[in-house]
Amino acid sequence: MMRLTLRALAALAAAALATAPVAAQDKVKIGYAISKTGPNAGGATITQIPNYEMWVKEVNDKGGLMIGGKRVPIEVMEYDDRSNSEEAVRAVERLVTQDKVDLLFPPWGTGLNLAVGPVFNKYGYPQLTFSAVTDRAPELAKRWPNSFWMLGTSKQYIDGLVGLLTKLRTDGKIGPNIAMISIADGFGIDLSQAARKGFTDAGFKLAYDKSYPIGTQDLSPLIGEAQRSGADTFVAFSYPPDTMALTEQSKVASYAPKVMFLGVGVGFPMYTQRFGANAEGIMSLGGWSKDNASTAAYAKKHEEMFKRGPDRWGSQIGYASLQMLEQAIERVGKIDRPAIIKELQTGTFDTVLGKVKLVDNQMQDHCCPAILPRV
């Protein structure tokens, strides 16, 4: 009986947090846990934090969010999750229960977004993930209807990659063997699982398949083994520090497979700055359209504010998600989280990507593997 009572109290507490009255509020408190240190810091400081800072500045420069007929400024609270899932969960709990934030931004990375998902759901906060890729997105969107998955599924990326590799094989430019490595984190686990099936179904053979722990600095043994496998194609589902190391250490080892597909980081501005001509032809996830005036204007603003360009994959999608959140809040007219979630589920939004309407809490049309873009 006591157990049922405690559960009921917990449910009531979550409901109260979700619908707490905010009449006459003089600020909107937004909080987030983000990887300022640890192996995820590179991705967070390139793709995520600049978008948060730029969007908040732009909204506050207008006087704030339009709520109840007046502009209400945003106040930000942040914690360093240290690239640790347990720390991220504790920080998000603290933001909700102690700091009493009105809204939450998501952390960086697939693993951390999966870790904090139950907390966002428990308290009824919208979770717009734009640095998480998983084939579980459709299932999670049903389990956590407050969650929104902006980067697509692993299968979508693998289907695109397999299509390209199949054409190259048909044209006689590559053989059937693939060497694959993957980081032992949510991103690498999910994508490598989808890749094994996709490659096998398309008649390719994995001549080498190895995972490595997050934080691994010396990847030269894996490069050597991939090189000795004789595979024409090398695929790495890597995080930014690994992507940089793989590019550098492959050059040292004179490893130049006919196709090199690397993970997160290839689209970072520092990648081309660091590797120059050696970056030509390296493939990765995502892409960027030169012909989209809105994303070009976004990139210019990003460069002016941070003295560097945005990530050519998740940044534009992340900024679009913040524009969607802003429009949803202003349409609802108050910080009513259930109503904001409903608007995100059903509304159509004007963003740097163009008009966006989510399907089953997922963005469907903005992901594909691509040759490293030039803007």
Where are these regions (language model features)?
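Bacterial N-terminal signal peptides that target proteins for export
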Residues: 1-10
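Sec/Tat signal peptide C-region and signal peptidase I cleavage site
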Residues: 19-24
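Extracytoplasmic "Venus flytrap"
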Residues: 31-55, 79-85, 108-109, 181-190, ...
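Beta-alpha junction/loop-to-helix N-cap segments that form part of ligand/metal-binding clefts
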Residues: 43-48, 65-139, 150, 212-219, ...
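Extracytoplasmic ligand/sensor domains, especially the bilobed periplasmic-binding protein
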Residues: 50, 101-207, 258-284
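Signal peptide-proximal N-terminal region
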Residues: 50-76, 171-173, 202-203
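Extracellular/periplasmic periplasmic-binding protein-like sensory domains
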Residues: 144, 247-319, 330
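Segments of small-molecule ligand-sensing domains
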Residues: 304-312, 326-375
